[in-house]
Design a protein with these regions (language model features):
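C-terminal motif of bacterial Sec signal peptides marking the signal peptidase cleavage site
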Residues: 12-15
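Contiguous hydrophobic, core-forming segments of folded domains
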Residues: 84-147
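Mid-length scaffold segments of soluble, non-membrane domains
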Residues: 121-126, 131-182
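Short, hydrophobic/π-rich interface segment
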Residues: 167-220
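C-terminal structured interaction module
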Residues: 215-250
């Protein structure tokens, strides 16, 4: 009888510990959602609207990025505030409304973030990708599922573009997307960066060579668009969804 009692006790302890370990992931109630897929653009030339931005207009704490329908601009939404950009007569223009449709959209509702200082050793795009995965695991984020992140500070340089696709062109490539509209570099300028990380959404919302999709906005709101390359500067801050109980969203 004694052995039965101890066996049941051990089983109960193991079960409780297993449940506690799973809580770290299961209680994170934010969900990354997406509409559209990069592979449909690149392989099929499908750049039609997949979602109306008005569908997320009334959601709180929305962070979103993507491309406008027909690839006529970039989508950046920070904390439910749109900073969408387009090219009009070779000039960058902003649209701060939800009166647009997207051919690709990735979004999540996050009401609290945890700030982390990025080590000075993290400089390149590749180093950043490894660092993001490492920090996510440290902070009990399930890296088998997509998650959003933010960065703030003054990078040494950022290469960016805002797409302005010729709708009669049915042959797509990443280089053609970059050159179709406006593109350039930002150097040593304070910015805010929104990104989504996933190792399982290649050709869906990340390109096949990376686990990250990032967009950038300058703090003075003079520029926003797709981030192509980055060299980090000193003192930059990285932010992950805060997994503490007070940060849960329904």
């Amino acid at each position: 009888m004694k052995y039965v009692f101890y066996s049941l006790l051990i089983f109960f302890i193991v079960a409780c510990n297993s449940k506690k370990r799973s809580i770290n992931y299961e209680e994170v109630n934010y969900k990354v959602e997406y509409k559209g897929a990069l592979k449909n653009m690149m392989q099929k030339g499908d750049i039609s609207a997949k979602v109306d931005l008005k569908e997320i207009e009334n959601l709180e704490n929305i962070y979103a990025l993507g491309a406008l329908e027909n690839l006529k601009g970039e989508i950046q939404i920070f904390d439910s505030k749109p900073f969408n950009t387009m090219v009009t007569d070779s000039v960058l223009t902003f649209d701060n409304s939800f009166n647009k449709k997207a051919t690709l959209l990735v979004f999540a509702s996050i009401n609290k973030w945890k700030s982390i200082s990025i080590p000075t050793a993290v400089v390149s795009h590749e180093q950043l990708e490894k660092y993001i995965e490492q920090e996510a695991k440290k902070n009990q984020i399930d890296t088998d599922k997509p998650f959003p992140f933010l960065m703030e500070g003054s990078p040494k340089s950022i290469d960016w573009h805002v797409i302005n696709w010729n709708t009669y062109d049915t042959v797509h490539s990443h280089d053609k997307h970059i050159s179709s509209g406006l593109n350039g570099s930002i150097k040593n300028k304070p910015v805010k960066i929104l990104g989504f990380y996933s190792s399982s959404h290649h050709a869906i919302f990340t390109h096949h060579t990376t686990n990250m999709h990032m967009h950038v906005k300058t703090l003075d709101n003079s520029l926003a668009g797709h981030l192509d390359e980055i060299i980090l500067g000193k003192g930059m801050i990285f932010k992950l969804p805060d997994n503490s109980p007070t940060s849960y969203v329904n």
